[in-house]
Amino acid sequence: NRPGCDNYMEPYDMENAKVAVQTTIREAANWKLVIENNRECYHCNGSHPELLKTLLEWDDVTDPRASQAFKDQVAACTSAWDAEKIPYAHASFGLRNRIVRMPLLDGTVSMTMDGKQGSKKLMGRIKNPDLGSMRILHLPHSWNHCMGDHLIVFTVWPISAQETLVTTKWLVHKDAVEGVDYDVARLREVWDATNDQDRRLAEENQRGINSDAYQPGPYSKTYEFGVINFLDWYSERMLNNLGEESAHVRKVAGS
């Protein structure tokens, strides 16, 4: 937990959280493709009907695609966040770490099928369940959604050149009682569906790349900036790891 993240995590009191359920799926796709699929959100509208019952399309009011209604909703939510002393200012620690808090779809408070609380017992010191979702990106292998009632933690691990494990953990307050405060099937329903949809997308991308007919194309700076940031971070890490040998690679890349 980086020092810069501490104040963002404080309201959730992670020392008093527990894992309600955990799943791991195997994807027949390269680890890098799995991360790129997560960083690219243009596919969401056509691929994730369950997730879009609560998740808004944008996560930044400066996004040129963001509607005025979205900007107005964010502005309205900040007063509630301020009242509960919930941090929400965007924070980035280079390209590797990013934190952003955004509201969920108006009228919903959690990533469940009906948008209602997945756990009756709220996390940490939180009193208001309608705090949207705090999203934490940690390259190279983790993204997270933190809501008032539960958190969802994702980790991605390569196991071969074209196989990846994706583990998802749903965390609730340590005193929440299964069958009383939360139902495991309901808690995991949205992301079980979303993970399987993302698995299919990553595997289809892998099959396409394996084809002799494959040709890479450009990324959109508007719709795919998350992928571009990931690739910039990844490329820089690889070059740094090469040390002196990277000079030739940098020269070729810049030519």
Mark where each language-model region is.
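C-terminal catalytic domain of Rieske-type non-heme iron oxygenases
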Residues: 1-255
